[in-house]
């Protein structure tokens, strides 16, 4: 996501002084989408990202750990539709490069056949540093996500949004699941990506609430001053403030094969943030849920997607995950002018994971699952 980034740092910390005081207008959006390259015959992951990056503007594409993965970045837009148009344009560019490189392009939360032991870490100082620091842990993190950025003005406001939106991470994951396979095997889950990612890396998964900007800044000082982390990009939580961009970054979504689904998810994330901004501005603040009250719902989302059960935070009764997402959309729509009609259609369809499993059950082949993802990724890009 391209936004103005500050240079100055708070003393002894990782934070730009002007974090959440400058930047894009509040409520504007951007996104990052991670895609994979594969061999057209074997459908296994195959390199080429570094060649693409050398030929394209840095504000449009960036490297993401391995040479078979490219991150597409959007500009700043007021509506999800503008973000989605950027993502589709980036996909078209990547598809052209993939053809020249003898690759196919696809995106899903994990690659169904991907073997992390065969992947090359890109020649970028940050990722070579992580390879030395984390070794096996970082090498096995072959996952692909959709990240949504929501611009926020105000340090205390962004922490309030961060604390409160955590309880909706399971909702975001359940509706976006797109990774039932890992290393060529069915995992009996609907989001292997979420499990692999949160269990592989330090400072990943569901974060604790902070309650105030000073508590958040104090934590960054705690891990930054002694060099536990060298940059904010080493914090991989499901939700995180992004001080350099002055955004709240929602990182809970599996990457979507169908770009129309990506647009619906961006709209849901934005409307949820709108709702929490209105809550903050009304002065009727609500307490943040502790991690222990969120994790069970997240586990259900990982395991079952929209077909699982959540514990309702208000009644403590089990409710269908699909109903919980519908309820979130209703609540968000009451405080937001954003169009959530595409989400309504999405909730009536099988999840991306169910689409993968349908192909697998029909063909008995994980390779055919990967082929179908690449086919659908290509088919969703209109000819120019």
Swiss-Prot record:
Q: What does the record give as EC number?
A: 6.3.2.2
Reactions this protein catalyses: L-cysteine + L-glutamate + ATP = gamma-L-glutamyl-L-cysteine + ADP + phosphate + H(+)
Give the organism's phylogenetic lineage.
Bacteria, Bacillati, Actinomycetota, Rubrobacteria, Rubrobacterales
EC class name: ligase
SUPFAM superfamilies from the UniProt entry: Glutamine synthetase/guanido kinase (SSF55931)
Q: Which family does it belong to?
A: Belongs to the glutamate--cysteine ligase type 2 family. YbdK subfamily.
Function of the protein: ATP-dependent carboxylate-amine ligase which exhibits weak glutamate--cysteine ligase activity.
The record's listing under InterPro entries reads:
GCL_type2/YbdK_subfam, GCS2, Gln_synth/guanido_kin_cat_dom, YbdK
Q: Which GO terms describe its biological process?
A: modified amino acid biosynthetic process
Q: What is this protein called?
A: Putative glutamate--cysteine ligase 2-2
Single GO term (MF): ATP binding
Q: Which UniProt keywords apply?
A: ATP-binding, Ligase, Nucleotide-binding
Top-level division of the source organism's lineage: Bacteria
